[in-house]
Amino acid sequence: MARRLSLLAVVLAMVAAVSASTAAAQSCGCASDQCCSKWGFCGTGSDYCGTGCQAGPCDVPATNDVSVASIVTPEFFAALVAQADDGCAAKGFYTRDAFLTAAGGYPSFGRTGSVDDSKREIAAFFAHANHETIKFCYIEEIDGPSKNYCDETSTQWPCMAGKGYYGRGPLQISWNFNYGPAGQSIGFDGLGDPDAVARSPVLAFQTALWYWTNNVHDAFVSGQGFGATIRAINGALECDGKNPTAVSNRVAYYQQFCQQFGVDPGSNLTC
C-alpha cells in the first residue's frame, strides 16, 4: 500500500510539473512544448527559447559565480548618483538596493563568461545609464511628453490614448513596442501605465535590464565590443558618423568604469 501511494505521489508530482509548464506557456497562448519568445511569439529553438524567453521550456543560460554586488559596490554606486546635484529630478531616486533587486531577476547579466567579462558588461551597462540619464540627473526624457513614440504599425502593442512612451529609467526605455513586452515580461501595464517606470526605482532598473538582456547582452558577451552596445541602444541616431560626440561620451564612460573595475575595455569600442 505504501509503495502504491509513493508511486501515486510521484505520478501526481509529474502531472503537476507538466501542468505548471503548460500553464506558463499558455499565458502567452503557446502549446506546452513551445516557448513564448521575448516578443510574445510561440515556437521552438533558440530564437524562441533563448534570451528573453517569457514562458514554456525556456533555455537556462550558463552563468558564472560572480557576485554583481561585489562589483557594484556601495562606493561605486554612491559615486555614480553623487554626480547629480540637488536640483536634479532623479536625486535620491536611483539606489543600489533597487538595482540589485532588479538584477536578481536577470541572472545572466554580469554573470556570463569570465570575471573580466562580467566586469566589462557591468561597466558597459552603467556607461550607457550614465549617458542616458545625464549622470543620473534624470528619470524621464527631457521634453519627453512633447515627443511622439507611438509606432502605429506595431499592432501587437497598440498605443493607448493619452499615454506617452517616451524615455524613462536608466536606459530611457522608449516606444510602445518596448513598453508593451517589457510590461508583459516584468509584470506591469507597460502600455496602460508607462509612468510606472518613473515612479519605482526597482521597475526603472528592471525595464533597463529587460532591454539590455533582450537587445544588448548577447552582442556584447559574444565579443562584438562596446561599439555593438551603442548600436543596439541608439545606433540609428548615433552610429556611422551621425553623432560622434554622443558616441565619444559613451565610450569615455565605459573606459572610466572599466578602469575603476580594473579590467581592459577591449577592442571595437565605437560604431
Swiss-Prot record:
Disulfide bonds listed in the record: 28-36, 30-42, 35-49, 88-137, 150-159, 239-271
Signal peptide (UniProt feature, chain positions): 1-20
Cited InterPro entries: Chitin-bd_1 (IPR001002), Chitin-binding_1_CS (IPR018371), Endochitinase-like_sf (IPR036861), Glyco_hydro_19 (IPR016283), Glyco_hydro_19_cat (IPR000726), Lysozyme-like_dom_sf (IPR023346)
Domain Chitin-binding type-1: 25-60
Domain of life: Eukaryota
MF annotations from Gene Ontology: chitin binding; chitinase activity; endochitinase activity
One record GO biological process: chitin catabolic process
Catalytic reactions of this protein: Random endo-hydrolysis of N-acetyl-beta-D-glucosaminide (1->4)-beta-linkages in chitin and chitodextrins
Residues carrying sugar: 268
Tissue spec. comment: Expressed in roots, leaves, sheaths and meristems.
Record keywords: Carbohydrate metabolism, Chitin degradation, Chitin-binding, Disulfide bond, Glycoprotein, Glycosidase, Hydrolase, Plant defense, Polysaccharide degradation, Signal
Active site residues according to the UniProt entry: 132
Gene3D superfamilies (alphabetical): 1.10.530.10, Endochitinase, domain 2, Endochitinase-like
Record PROSITE patterns: CHIT_BIND_I_1, CHIT_BIND_I_2, CHITINASE_19_1
EC number: 3.2.1.14
Functional note: May function in reproductive organs during embryogenesis and seed maturation.
Family: Belongs to the glycosyl hydrolase 19 family. Chitinase class IV subfamily.
Name under which the protein is recorded: Chitinase 6
Organism: Oryza sativa subsp. japonica (Rice)
Name of the encoding gene: Cht6
